[in-house]
Amino acid sequence: RQRQMCIRDSHNIVFIDSDKILMSNDGGVFLTTDGGNTFTMKNDNMVTTQFYSTAIHPTDSDYVLGGTQDNGTWRLNTAGKQAGVEVYGGDGGFAHIDQVDPDYQFGATTYGNIFRSVNGGQSFGSYSNVTNSDGTDAGFFINPSVIDGVNKAMYVTFDTVSILRQKDYTKLSAHDFININLGSGATAYKVSPHTSGVLFVGTASG
């Protein structure tokens, strides 16, 4: 389809002539035949989207929520190679669906920017954007997080010595910090499926 611009993060440019140019970028392959005034997306039958994270619905295996590299967060809920619905723009980050109550779904953009759905993914709104005390971004660019569907808690990487905990994600609750010197930022989480309140953490250094 035609559009007035293509995605800015380009990886390669091929000049066919002075007006016809092929570009590859985070959105796939684009062609301009008028020197860059308009672009046509050339992604038919090509898989060009990279998912950072996906979450699967507990009762509908065709329903997937996923954050993609520079292409937003998408909801896919039909079998096969069908078009999905972009539920949030920008860079997509970690995605979560509450396995106990799937009305609660979460996605993220960059750093501590988290958005939430309370109606099963039909709509999303901004939920949390925690920053350092000086207002700078906290955590990683694509920031790891996890939810505990039993206790309705969310854990988010903050810095090398603390993990942010949202105590009750069913509402706009206060957060606190789990202060532990990890040596490096937390990059992976796993909520114990056996013992309530137990969280396993992996870090950038092991």
Segments from the language model and where they lie:
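Conserved beta-strand position repeated once per blade in WD40 beta-propeller domains
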Residues: N12-F15, F51-A55, F94, P144, ...
